Amino acid sequence: MEHKIPEDSHWWFSSRTRALTTIMKQFLPKRADFHLLDVGCGAGNMIHHLSRFGRVKGLEIDPRPVKMARQRGYDVDQFDATQPMPFPDNSFDAVTALDVIEHNQDDLAILSDSYRLLKPGGYMIITVPALMWLWSHNDDINAHVRRYTAAELKQKLAQTGFVIRRVTYNNFFIFPLAAALILLRRLAGEKPQLASHHLHEDEYQVEMEPASPPVNALLTLVGKVEAGLIRLINLPIGTSLIAVGQKPLQR
């Protein structure tokens, strides 16, 4: 059975990838001996993009995307990252947790263990959904615990020892439309149909609302423009956040 997931073509994932790649190029070298850990890697879509910076190891709790990631040729283990991760201290040059920590009651535990795994000077790169008042049915179906403000994310990174290198909102241009749509749906009590609605139980797909081809193409273009803007400035508002923290060379 062929497995398909929306990361390959959905505007939200392609926009996030462009913004992340833009930011990572500012901090990460491209070296064969550069080791990255992608925590909560899903089916490995971002491993493909992270691999341009070095060698990538993935961890994922759900066996379905683990199977898919391995079929794609990625080095992924099934593991619950809320537990101490099975690597020695100072093992990695960078750790990514991309839309991961919002699923966990104890988000600080993941950040703290990621800090342990990083070499001195290593980078922690995070994406999370932004602003609790934007809570929607997508948050419920994806088992989110919270959404964050920039100040909250900075505080959690600092609390676990990281030096803040960059924090920016993402999806700035679509923010007014997204906020209006969420509020209108909330008032109407409407629950949008999600992409995985018709999947067989052994298939895997990230829970994301589908978009028509014209809308998907337009929003993908908006994401390209926004990635160019993120190269220059931190955006003041958006539906998501991207953060980069660095483990100090000495403590």
Predicted ranges, named:
Residues 70, 136-140, 177-181:
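Short aromatic-enriched loop/helix-cap "lid" or pocket-rim segments at secondary-structure transitions
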Residues 99-103:
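A short His-aromatic
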Residues 162-172:
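Conserved S-adenosyl-L-methionine
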Residues 51, 70, 105, 119, ...:
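Short conserved AdoMet
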Residues 5, 124-146, 150-158:
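Short, glycine-/aromatic-enriched active-site segment of Class I SAM-dependent methyltransferases
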Residues 108-123:
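A short glycine-rich, Lys/Arg-flanked "PGG" loop and its adjoining helix->strand segment in the class I
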Residues 174-251:
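A C-terminal cap/extension of S-adenosyl-L-methionine-dependent methyltransferases
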Residues 1-90, 94-98, 108-111, 213, ...:
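Conserved N-terminal segment of class I S-adenosyl-L-methionine
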